[in-house]
């Protein structure tokens, strides 16, 4: 472990911190990891429960007692006692399955041009026969005015039956850029969709980090109340794998179970997801994991700002986007992993740093010492 303290009170302490960090990294050849939040296995409490239950014999496909208990805990947290809760294996499978289940054959899905389903899911939605209908992105978010205009303009066109109909609105919380929709923004989008008979679907791959943000003025119950369907991400928030789809009204997703299987998203060993989500929703672990990651992300952000680096997006969650001179980027790459956000620029590049349950205070301090 790196025992490095980051102090801003004197130039001397900063210098000593930096020199010791570089010496430690050089002698141990240890890399610091900030590339994403699902590169390690699983939170120790989840691993412990998986090991403790490993030799138990239970029924498959999520019909076991652990999955039922996890569903009950999720319904309670969502204040939605009658909700459908279905576990799926991963985020792309979840999005493709839910969107296919919600849409008629002639419909497409409205989403920001930067949306994960439009950019980083290899055409999974299109593979099911549905088009992604893109809207302008504002730091990852869609605007209520753009959503309203798109739907209204579609039906105002005399030839609308010859075009792909907007069948649902897809948003993410937090967005691809780590930004979050406020409660008011969610309420307005929900009203627009429901007044036009269009379901609102929220991708919650990193939902825990949105809930843990200091800027969050909404709860999980608010999400369940305002969205027709959403999912609680496990893969990126401490679980080894798995996502939990929630539909407040089960009639919104009729025949969902066989559709999950058709899309290759149903696990025979469903208990594995039940154990994980039951653990995540016991003693507030889900939010505690996210709070830890967000706190360290904010510490990273403050260090970048104090060193004079430009913050590309005002993200209050565990993803931070920073503009780095290319020479700085290349120097840091020798000691840490992170992702280029887009194409490398001629002189400077936007870089993404991500924290998780596995990120330690020492990791962050060591990286700060390199700046």
Give residue ranges: language-model regions.
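Conserved C-terminal alpha-helix-loop-beta "cap" of PLP-dependent enzymes
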Residues: 104-106, 298-371
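PLP-dependent aminotransferase-class I/II
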Residues: 129-167, 171-174, 181-188
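Catalytic PLP-binding core of fold-type I/II PLP enzymes
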Residues: 181-213
């Amino acid at each position: 472990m790196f025992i490095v303290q980051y102090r801003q009170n004197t130039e001397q302490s900063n210098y000593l911190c930096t020199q010791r960090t570089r010496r430690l990294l050089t002698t141990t050849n240890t890399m610091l990891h900030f590339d994403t939040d699902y590169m390690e296995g699983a939170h120790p409490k989840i691993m412990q429960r998986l090991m403790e239950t490993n030799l138990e014999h239970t029924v498959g496909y999520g019909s076991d007692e652990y999955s039922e208990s996890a569903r009950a805990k999720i319904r309670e947290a969502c204040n939605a006692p009658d909700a459908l809760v279905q576990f799926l294996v991963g985020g792309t499978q979840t999005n493709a399955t839910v969107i296919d289940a919600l849409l008629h054959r002639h419909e497409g899905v409205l989403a920001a041009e930067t949306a994960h389903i439009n950019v980083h899911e290899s055409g999974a939605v299109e593979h099911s026969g549905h088009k992604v209908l893109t809207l302008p992105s504002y730091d990852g978010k869609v605007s209520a005015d753009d959503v309203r205009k798109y739907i209204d303009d579609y039906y105002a066109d005399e030839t609308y039956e010859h075009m792909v109909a907007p069948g649902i609105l897809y948003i993410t919380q937090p967005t691809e850029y780590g930004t979050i929709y406020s409660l008011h923004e969610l309420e307005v989008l929900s009203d627009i969709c429901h007044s036009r008979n269009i379901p609102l679907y929220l991708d919650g791959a990193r939902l825990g980090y949105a809930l843990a943000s200091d800027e969050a003025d909404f709860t999980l119950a608010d999400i369940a109340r305002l969205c027709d369907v959403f999912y609680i991400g496990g893969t990126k928030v401490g679980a080894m794998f798995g996502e939990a789809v929630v539909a407040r009204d089960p009639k919104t997703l009729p025949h969902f179970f066989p559709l999950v299987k058709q899309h290759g998203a149903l696990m025979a060993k469903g208990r594995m997801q039940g154990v994980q989500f039951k653990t995540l929703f016991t003693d507030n672990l889900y939010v505690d994991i996210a709070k830890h990651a967000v706190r360290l992300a904010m510490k990273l952000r403050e260090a970048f700002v104090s060193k004079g680096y430009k913050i590309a997006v005002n993200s209050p969650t565990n993803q931070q986007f920073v503009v780095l001179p290319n020479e700085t980027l290349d120097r840091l790459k020798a000691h840490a992993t992170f992702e280029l956000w887009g194409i490398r620029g001629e002189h400077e590049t936007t870089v993404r740093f991500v924290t998780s349950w596995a990120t330690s205070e020492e990791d962050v301090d060591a990286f700060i010492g390199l700046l």
